[in-house]
Amino acid sequence: MAKHPVPKKKTSKSKRDMRRSHHALVAPNLTECPQCHSKKLQHHICPSCGYYNGRQVLAV
């Protein structure tokens, strides 16, 4: 049977945590829709009213 490669040295908690430092989740940046005042993603059509950039783009 073939042997699988294994780490030669134990990874310290510091090295492990430094590697994981970029793994945090980022909360979506929600803004208020100027038309209906519901929460929406920036640079996206409002899912409640269908407005984007001051004009209706989607019939809701």
Curated annotation (Swiss-Prot):
The keyword Ribonucleoprotein applies. Coiled coil: none annotated. The keyword Oxidoreductase does not apply. One of its GO terms (cellular component) is large ribosomal subunit. Keywords: Ribonucleoprotein, Ribosomal protein. It comes from the Bacteria. GO terms for biological process: translation. Residues 1-23 have a biased composition (Basic residues). Residues 1-26 are annotated as: Disordered. Pfam families: Ribosomal_L32p (PF01783). One of its GO terms (molecular function) is structural constituent of ribosome. PANTHER family: 50S RIBOSOMAL PROTEIN L32, LARGE RIBOSOMAL SUBUNIT PROTEIN BL32. NCBIfam families: rpmF_bact. Belongs to the bacterial ribosomal protein bL32 family. This is Large ribosomal subunit protein bL32. It comes from Deinococcus geothermalis (strain DSM 11300 / CIP 105573 / AG-3a).
